[in-house]
Amino acid sequence: MARYRGPRLRVVRRLGELPGLTRKNARRAYPPGQHGQNRRKRSEYAIRLEEKQKLRFNYGVSEKQLIRYVRRARRATGSTGQTLLQLLEMRLDNTVFRLGMAGTIPAARQLVNHGHILVNDRVVDIASYQCRPGDVIKVRDQDKSRKLVQANMEYPGLANLPSHLEFDKNTLIGKVNGVIEREWIALNINELLVVEYYSRQA
C-alpha cells in the first residue's frame, strides 16, 4: 500500500488528531460518509486496525515500511511498541518536523527530498534516514533553503521541542542528544494494539 496523498482532513475525521499529517482540525467529529454519525460497536480487530492506521498516516509511511519497522522493533530489546514509536520518531523527516523546520511531516519530507537539509555537514535526501544521538541537523547554506525553513518556522506544527533535541533558531542548527522518550510523542496512540495487529502478519 503506497503513501497516502488524498484529502488529509478526511483522514483526521476518521482517525482523530494526527499532528504530523496536518495542522488543521476537522470541523465534524464523526467520520466522513453517509453513515459516519451512526457508528456501530467496533470489533477488536477494527480497533487495532484503526490504531495501526493512525501510525501510518501520522508518520506518512507505507504499509511495507511499517511492517519493516515492526520487525526491527521486535528484534530490539525492551518494549516492542515503544521501540516502534522511537524508530518512527527518529526518522529524519519527523526530526526536521519536531525541530520546527516544517509545519507537518509531509512538508519536512519535501525539505529533505529536495536536498535542503544537512546531517553532519552532508546533504541527506532520504526521509527515512534514522537519526542518532550526536547527529547535527542544519539547513543548507543557500538562500532558498534558509527562506523556506524560516517561513515554515513562523507556523510550527508543534510548539514544544522534545527533550532529546535542541535547536538554535538564529543559526537554524539542531542537534540530536538522545532517543525520544515516550512522554514526548505527540500522537495519541496505543502502540500495543499496533503490535497486536501485526502479531500474525509481520
From Swiss-Prot:
GO cellular component, one term: small ribosomal subunit
PROSITE patterns named among the record's database cross-references: RIBOSOMAL_S4, S4
GO molecular function: rRNA binding; structural constituent of ribosome
InterPro entries associated with the record: Ribosomal_uS4, Ribosomal_uS4_bac-type, Ribosomal_uS4_CS, Ribosomal_uS4_N, S4_RNA-bd, S4_RNA-bd_sf
CDD domains on file: S4
Protein's UniProt keywords contain Cell wall biogenesis/degradation: no
Superkingdom, natural source: Bacteria
Chain ranges of the S4 RNA-binding domain: 90-152
Keyword annotations: Ribonucleoprotein, Ribosomal protein, RNA-binding, rRNA-binding
GO biological processes: ribosomal small subunit biogenesis; translation
SMART domains hit by this protein: Ribosomal_S4, S4
Ranges where the record places region Disordered: 22-43
Assembly information from the UniProt record: Part of the 30S ribosomal subunit. Contacts protein S5. The interaction surface between S4 and S5 is involved in control of translational fidelity.
UniProt function note: One of the primary rRNA binding proteins, it binds directly to 16S rRNA where it nucleates assembly of the body of the 30S subunit. With S5 and S12 plays an important role in translational accuracy.
UniProt family annotation: Belongs to the universal ribosomal protein uS4 family.
Record's protein name: Small ribosomal subunit protein uS4
Source organism: Gloeothece citriformis (strain PCC 7424)
